[in-house]
Design a protein with these regions (language model features):
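Bacterial N-terminal signal peptides that target proteins for export
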Residues: 1-6
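C-terminal motif of bacterial Sec signal peptides marking the signal peptidase cleavage site
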Residues: 14-16
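Bacterial signal peptide processing site
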Residues: 18-21
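Noncatalytic scaffold domains of N-terminal-nucleophile
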Residues: 23-64, 68, 76-77, 81-241, ...
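Internal maturation/activation junctions in enzymes
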Residues: 32-33, 266, 319-385
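Flexible, polar/acidic helix-loop-strand segments at domain edges
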Residues: 307-308
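Protein kinase glycine-rich loop
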Residues: 312
Length: 385
């Protein structure tokens, strides 16, 4: 019956459109919207199994850096630090030392969560993204420039993780990224696609000189791109720890850039950088049962929405009996994907309604686990048509 009802609804909708009193529009021409981020293709790869260790990252150079650190006797945290420093070079659009991060660590007995997410500048208030006319800024109005820049926490958090679980010297973990920065790395398909389609990098003289040639064209795939300035900052971090970024001349350069933005200055200060501290939070763990076995799933708690969103989606799918839907040629079919999509929508609705910085916002009922309550998820599953 559902397909028939869908066709009836579609026919009614088309009928309403056809009865538009202004008459049909003959000049309509559909315009394909821009992708939010340039795609770099998909390559199917086989699964892998390992008994000792594995490294996964968004770029092969970062993956290899972590692999070499492990082979040298480093810990998982050591490898993660090396991976992040390389990613800041080869995947600058996605992550870097000027941003924030979450780290979930499991030593075989205990799950720990280290919060290195950015924090708002101390001078920020509720009017930060409100225009002079009292209306909220559009996304691009707020995000481009210094206004949206928060206090970076990645390096301070990684430093804390290394103090707890590192085996190799801190400076050693900077070496892969330093070598690649000074010697150069080949521009990937993904990086080329993203800088070619970016509408804002060329407006910044420093970014324009780095990502584009003299004609303003994005560096082609395979171009050897060097970043000695990044290497210089990493050398300071190697020698001084996170303070090499959060204090001194590098910190001052960051603040000057943010506050001095020509059209959208921000409020980040030297005090914000010097005062940043990474926090340890209790991992959010819950039991998940299938028809075959039971799992203990742990993830990062708020301010991350990861553990809650994943837990809610899995719980809602269980109550919707998604596991009873057979695969189609080994792949999920339309009915299963419908349930998954709707479960995700419900989870993200709760994310937008409830999840925020726990230092300022209380969990529903005083406990984040209330969002994973079995009866609550059952009621959410009933909303799926």
């Amino acid at each position: 019956m559902k397909p028939s009802l869908a066709l009836i609804a579609l026919a009614a909708l088309l009928g309403a459109c056809a009865s538009n009193p202004s008459g049909p529009t003959t000049s309509f021409s559909y315009a394909v919207p821009d992708q939010p981020e340039g795609a770099s293709g998909y390559t199917e790869k086989p699964g892998w199994a390992t008994q000792k260790y594995a490294v996964a990252a968004a770029n092969p150079l970062a993956t290899d850096a972590g692999f070499q650190i492990l082979k040298a006797g480093g810990s998982a945290v050591d490898a993660a630090i090396a991976v992040q420093m390389v990613l800041g070079l080869v995947e600058p659009q996605s992550s870097g030392i000027g941003g924030g991060a979450f780290l979930l660590h499991f030593n075989g007995k205990k799950v720990e969560a280290l919060d290195g997410r950015e924090t708002a500048p101390a001078a920020a208030d509720e009017k930060l993204f409100i225009k002079a006319d009292g209306k909220p800024m559009s996304f691009m109005e707020g995000v481009v420039g210094g206004r949206s820049v928060g206090t970076p926490g990645t390096v301070r958090m990684l430093e804390k993780a290394h103090q707890q679980y590192g085996k190799l010297p801190w400076a050693t973990l900077m070496q892969p990224a330093i070598v690649l920065s000074e010697g150069g790395f080949k521009v990937s398909d993904r990086l080329h696609t993203l800088i070619k389609s970016d509408a804002h990098l060329k407006k910044d003289p420093v970014a324009a000189a780095y990502f584009y040639d003299a004609k303003g064209e994005a560096w082609p795939v395979g171009h050897l791109l060097k970043n000695p300035e990044y290497a210089a900052v990493l050398r300071k971090i190697a020698a001084q720890g996170a303070s090499g970024l959060m204090e001194g001349e590098v910190a001052q350069a960051i603040v000057t850039k943010v506050q001095g933005h020509a059209t959208n200055p921000g409020q980040l200060s030297m005090a914000d950088l010097a005062g940043y501290r990474s926090q340890s939070r209790a991992a959010l763990c819950h039991d998940y049962k299938t028809s075959v076995r039971e799992f203990r799933i742990c993830g990062f708690p708020p301010p991350s929405s990861g553990a809650l969103a994943v837990g809610q989606i899995l719980g809602i799918l269980n109550h919707a009996n998604a596991g009873a839907i057979p695969l189609e040629n080994g792949q999920p079919g339309a009915n299963w994907l419908h349930l998954y999509t709707e479960a995700s929508r419900l989870a993200f609705a709760d994310r937008g309604q409830y999840v925020a910085d726990p230092d300022f916002v209380q969990a529903p009922g005083g406990n984040w686990m209330s969002l994973l309550d079995n009866d609550y998820l059952a009621s959410r599953a009933k909303l799926i048509g």
